[in-house]
A protein has these predicted regions:
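Juxtamembrane helix-boundary/capping and inter-helix hinge elements in multi-pass membrane proteins
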Residues: 60, 95-98, 174-179, 189-191, ...
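Glycine/proline-centered hinge or cleavage motifs at structural transition points of membrane proteins
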Residues: 187-189, 201
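Alpha-helical transmembrane segments of integral membrane proteins
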Residues: 7, 270-305
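Membrane-water interface segments at the C-terminal ends of transmembrane alpha-helices
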Residues: 11-45, 59-174, 202-222, 256-272, ...
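Short hydrophobic, aromatic-rich alpha-helical segments embedded in or entering the lipid bilayer
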Residues: 48-59, 230-242, 329
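Short, Lys/Arg-rich, polar N-terminal cytosolic tail immediately upstream
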Residues: 1-12
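Glycine-rich helix-loop "coupling/hinge" segments at transmembrane-helix boundaries
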Residues: 124, 222-248
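Helix-loop-helix hairpin linking two adjacent transmembrane segments in secondary transporters
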Residues: 240-264
Length: 329
């Protein structure tokens, strides 16, 4: 008989203690709440197993509208942020923009406030009795459109979250090898065709990662739809109403809706990973993209786009700072 191999003793060094601590933290604050929520979604009031909460979600139009509303607003905001942030990142990476460092700081600051603060500031600015609304009405006789509802949520979320896509795409442009772009131009691929044929395919995995972050943040946003959504319900708002209903709270319904939200976001995450993994490119930026100075109308348009977009996005933070020092007594 062969002798048994001696068992390896666990070495309780610093890294082992950190690993065990992180694992316990993960189980307590992530796995346990998920398991608890899953159990509440399938256990009825009598303590038995039931699918009644899920059946109610998929049979009542109220909950169906909330699911569709969350998907609709998340997809719309994601698309708009991609359309806003990608040109901004491209311009600031390839064109010499004055005060580019200050603009990048303002872009980061615009995304750092909580959704409640951003939504509240936009109500104070463009609400029915907002500062900008009254100024345009009293000065030019122009009545500003309503900031509330679906379009208001889209505007507020897009201006707050476009910075996520910008940061991802800016990093991708820094790792882009300019020799590929120069080679395409020497072969006759230039202008808009160069962007769609060469640049976008190279940054697509990173662009999808930024878009995923925006989708997740929008899908989970409670503050903005609650403040300016009015009758436009999303899943986080419905979960809150179910959990703290005046008629009678329902932990089971809130848990079932939360599980559905987790399933939807997980499916979107897996879809993004599948698409991104098929478009992965490995390259070393031996010849990185360098910002060049433009002249004439192109230079004016590039600066105008950057300043206007960043200016609109930073307005809520500026107004909050201004309001905190204003004497209202």
């Amino acid at each position: 008989m062969s002798a048994k191999a001696p068992r390896k003793k666990i070495r309780w060094d610093l890294w082992m203690i950190v690993t065990v601590g992180v694992s316990i933290f993960y189980m307590l604050f992530l796995l346990y709440p998920l398991i608890s929520m899953l159990s509440k979604s399938v256990i009825g009031e009598d303590g038995g197993f039931t699918w009644q909460y899920f059946a109610k979600v998929f049979h009542k139009k109220y909950y169906q509208r909330a699911i569709w509303g969350s998907l609709k607003i998340s997809a719309t905001v994601t698309l708009i942020t991609v359309l806003l942030a990608t040109p901004l990142a491209y311009i600031m990476s390839t064109v010499k923009i004055r005060f580019a460092g200050a603009l990048q700081i303002l872009i980061l600051v615009s995304s750092m406030s909580a959704p409640f603060i951003g939504a509240y500031a936009w109500i104070m600015l463009c609400g029915r009795n907002g500062t900008i609304t009254n100024f345009l009405l009293n000065t030019f006789g122009f009545k500003l459109g309503d900031i509330y509802g679906f379009k208001g949520c889209v505007i507020v979320m897009s201006l707050q979250l476009y910075s996520l896509v910008f940061m991802f795409v800016s990093g991708a442009f820094k790792n882009l090898d300019n020799s590929l772009i120069e080679a395409s131009e020497s072969l006759g691929c230039s202008g808009v065709r160069k962007i769609f044929k060469i640049v976008l395919p190279l940054i697509l995995p990173t662009l999808l990662s930024g878009a995923l972050m925006v989708f997740m943040r929008t899908f989970a946003d409670y503050g903005t739809p609650m403040l300016i959504g009015e009758n436009y319900n999303t899943l986080p708002v419905v979960v809150y109403k179910e959990f703290l209903s005046e008629i009678g709270s329902s932990d089971g319904m809130a848990a079932a809706i939360s599980i559905i939200a987790i399933v939807i976001t997980t499916a979107v995450f897996l879809l993004q990973k599948y698409i991104a993994n098929r478009k992965v490119f490995s390259m070393s930026a031996l010849h990185p993209v360098e910002a060049k100075k433009l002249h004439g109308v192109k230079n004016v348009l590039a600066h105008a786009y950057c300043y206007i977009l960043v200016g609109l996005a930073i307005m809520p933070q500026c107004y909050v700072i201004y309001s905190s020092f204003r004497n209202t007594s």
